[in-house]
C-alpha cells in the first residue's frame, strides 16, 4: 500500500515537472514566453524550430531589466541554460526574420523548459550515492516538497507586501479625500464671506 502511494505521488510529481509548449511563429514577428522564477534557480531549456529555406529565427532570454541571460541566432535545434540571480519575471523570446523579397510562411517552434528541482539528475545522484530506486524516488519527492513549500512562502510574502501596499494606498486616498474636502469647505466659506462683504459694500444687504 505504501509503495503504491509512493508510486502515485511520484507520477504526480513527474506530471508537474517540465513545461513544454509548441506554437507557430508568424514571419517577421516575435513571441515571448514569460514566467516568474525564484532567485538562484537553474533554468534549462531545449528548443526545436521547423526548417524553412531563407527564413531564420533567433532567441533571447532576459529579465525585466533587459539583461541578456542567453542568446542565439539562426537556431534550428539546441539547448540553453541560465541562472536566475534574483526573483523576477524572466522571458524567452523567439524572433522571426524573413527577407523583404521573400513571402514568408509560419514556422513551428517547440520549447521545453525545466527549472530548480526539475533540473536535477536523480539517476546520477542515486548511482553516486548508491541509493535504491525507492530511495531515489523519496529524495525526488523530498526536494519537490521543499520547492513547493518555498513557493508558498514566497507567495505569502508577496501577498503580505501587496496587502501592505494596498493599505498604504487606501490611507493615502483617505487622507487626500479629507484634505480635498477641507479645501472645498474653506473655499466655500471664503466665497460666502467675500460675497457678503461685496453685497454689503453695494448696500444690497444690511
UniProtKB/Swiss-Prot annotation:
This protein's UniProt keywords: Developmental protein, Membrane, Signal, Transmembrane, Transmembrane helix
Name under which the protein is recorded: Transmembrane emp24 domain-containing protein bai
Ranges in the topological domain labelled Cytoplasmic: 194-206
Entry keyword Transmembrane helix: yes
Family: Belongs to the EMP24/GP25L family.
Signal peptide: 1-20
Superkingdom: Eukaryota
Localization terms from the record: Membrane
Membrane topology: Single-pass type I membrane protein
Segments crossing the lipid bilayer: 173-193
All residue ranges annotated as the GOLD domain in the record: 30-140
Amino acid at each position: 500500500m505504501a509503495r503504491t502511494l509512493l508510486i502515485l505521488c511520484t507520477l504526480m510529481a513527474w506530471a508537474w515537472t517540465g513545461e513544454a509548449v509548441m506554437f507557430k511563429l508568424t514571419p517577421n514577428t516575435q513571441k515571448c514566453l514569460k514566467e516568474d522564477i525564484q532567485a538562484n534557480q537553474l533554468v534549462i531549456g531545449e528548443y526545436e524550430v521547423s526548417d524553412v529555406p531563407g527564413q531564420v529565427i533567433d532567441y533571447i532570454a532576459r529579465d525585466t531589466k533587459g539583461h541578456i541571460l542567453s542568446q542565439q541566432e539562426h537556431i534550428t535545434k539546441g539547448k540553453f541554460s541560465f541562472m536566475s540571480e534574483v526573483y523576477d519575471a524572466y522571458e524567452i523570446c523567439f524572433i522571426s526574420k524573413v527577407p523583404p523579397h521573400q513571402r514568408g510562411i509560419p514556422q513551428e517552434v517547440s520549447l521545453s523548459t525545466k527549472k530548480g528541482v526539475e533540473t536535477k539528475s536523480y539517476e546520477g545522484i542515486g548511482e553516486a550515492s548508491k541509493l535504491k530506486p525507492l530511495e531515489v524516488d523519496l529524495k525526488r519527492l523530498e526536494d519537490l516538497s521543499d520547492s513547493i513549500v518555498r513557493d508558498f512562502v514566497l507567495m505569502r510574502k508577496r501577498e503580505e507586501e501587496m496587502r501592505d501596499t494596498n493599505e498604504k494606498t487606501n490611507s493615502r486616498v483617505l487622507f487626500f479625500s479629507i484634505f480635498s474636502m477641507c479645501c472645498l469647505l474653506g473655499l466655500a466659506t471664503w466665497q460666502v464671506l467675500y460675497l457678503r462683504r461685496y453685497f454689503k459694500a453695494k448696500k444690497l444687504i444690511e
